[in-house]
């Protein structure tokens, strides 16, 4: 069994997280802002103002998504081999956990709408894959050469 190159894994995870954070911010502010307003209205609250602390929470969430995506990629390399195909699968698995099933629990509570869930889930399907591929491209196993499949 080979050892994980933790520095490369963290760098790849950070790159993936930055991609996820930027794309999520742009998407939520520009594409689904009206959907969020409907959720706020349904909850009987005014539109929320983003504060530095609020943005930090989003950054922590996307940091987790990025790091876990690349950690999955690193672990999956043993059975699937290094390369973009494995990165795609790591991105899909992370998407299922974070973007598909995670928000679903908030729909019956009224904190998330079906329309918002579908739109965000569809968008994050693609961004999760792109971020995983970008982060995985930076990963190299400790010691030795490797060939991407």
Report residues per predicted region.
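Juxtamembrane/disordered regions of integral membrane proteins
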Residues: 1-149
């Amino acid at each position: 069994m080979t050892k994980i190159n933790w520095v490369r894994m963290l760098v790849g995870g950070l790159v993936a997280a930055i991609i996820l954070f930027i794309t999520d911010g742009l998407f939520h502010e520009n594409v689904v802002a009206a959907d969020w307003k409907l959720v706020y209205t349904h909850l009987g609250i005014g539109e929320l103002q983003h504060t530095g602390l609020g943005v930090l929470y989003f950054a922590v969430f996307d940091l987790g998504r990025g790091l876990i995506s690349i950690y999955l990629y690193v672990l999956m390399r043993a059975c699937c081999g290094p390369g973009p195909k494995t990165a795609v699968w790591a991105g899909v698995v992370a998407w299922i956990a974070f973007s598909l099933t995670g928000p679903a629990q908030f729909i019956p509570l009224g904190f998330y709408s079906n329309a918002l869930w579908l739109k965000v889930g569809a968008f994050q399907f693609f961004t999760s894959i792109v971020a995983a591929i970008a982060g995985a491209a930076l990963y190299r196993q400790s010691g030795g050469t490797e060939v991407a499949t």
